[in-house]
């Protein structure tokens, strides 16, 4: 059973997050291992396994990038495979330049420049994310898979920039 079916949701990117949360809580109550403490070892093991699946499904579906990757996996795209990397050299060059810029900001300890950098990367992420949503909604899976790969780069860059921000603020 796929994660969407487990939570009673349509297998699509745009989901009802409050409904996901309610269903998660219901499933957790229903399959919590403590409810099976007096059961047979097989029942206890099944409850632990089911609870782990519910937790994994919850973590996957509530995270936008993980949800997109999972949806694509249902359509035959294994984005964890080494064969599925970004081949867009212009995008990769841009990422290298952005990484170099972030290193320069770190060396200079320039908080104002970092704030501007974070806003720019967030804008790039948001724009690419909107494209990905449209691609998933239109079921252009191969193009959406490429967008997800690029979003991963931007997400890691944003995370690095935010870590630098914390480091500079602690100074």
UniProtKB/Swiss-Prot annotation:
Highest taxon listed in the record's lineage: Bacteria
Keywords from the named record: Chaperone
Residue stretches making up the J domain: 2-74
Pfam family, one: HSCB_C
Purpose: Co-chaperone involved in the maturation of iron-sulfur cluster-containing proteins. Seems to help targeting proteins to be folded toward HscA.
Protein family (similarity comment): Belongs to the HscB family.
Name of this protein: Co-chaperone protein HscB
Source species: Enterobacter sp. (strain 638)
